[in-house]
């Protein structure tokens, strides 16, 4: 995606994912967003069986996820910049995170008080903003 088009594309994407029937999907996903704090142990951890199906491909994460979606639960792990959760998308900067935000409802799902307080603000007051082990869990991200 060309840098000059990113800002316009991101703004269009946010409009697309926050209105109409897609807006309902985004609000449902956003209502389930969780900020997971340090030392968190999931109550669902017991009985988990890892089948070692971990892939680290050199490709767009959403394209890879689409290829694997039929084989069970699929997750995309992506490191967020706590200073700008859109990855610069809304400012027109090109980055992997910006493209992911432009192609999905990820940014509207993260653009909430819960994420700003539990992830962005918390990270801001660390010695270095990347010292946090917190993560943002967004179930059912919709991608186009």
Predicted stretch roles:
Residues 1-144:
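Macrodomain-like recognition of ADP-ribose-binding/processing modules
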């Amino acid at each position: 995606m060309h840098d000059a088009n990113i800002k316009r594309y991101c703004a269009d994407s946010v409009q697309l994912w926050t209105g109409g029937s897609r807006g309902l999907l985004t609000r449902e996903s956003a209502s389930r967003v969780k900020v997971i704090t340090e030392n968190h142990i999931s109550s669902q951890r017991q009985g988990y069986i890892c089948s070692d199906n971990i892939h680290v491909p050199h490709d767009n994460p959403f394209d890879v996820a689409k290829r694997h979606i039929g084989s069970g639960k699929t997750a995309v792990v992506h490191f967020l910049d706590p200073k700008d959760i859109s990855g610069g998308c809304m400012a027109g900067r090109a980055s992997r995170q910006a493209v992911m935000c432009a192609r999905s409802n990820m940014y509207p799902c993260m653009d909430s008080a819960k994420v700003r307080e539990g992830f962005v603000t918390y990270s801001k007051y660390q010695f270095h903003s990347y010292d946090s082990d917190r993560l943002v869990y967004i179930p059912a991200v919709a991608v186009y």
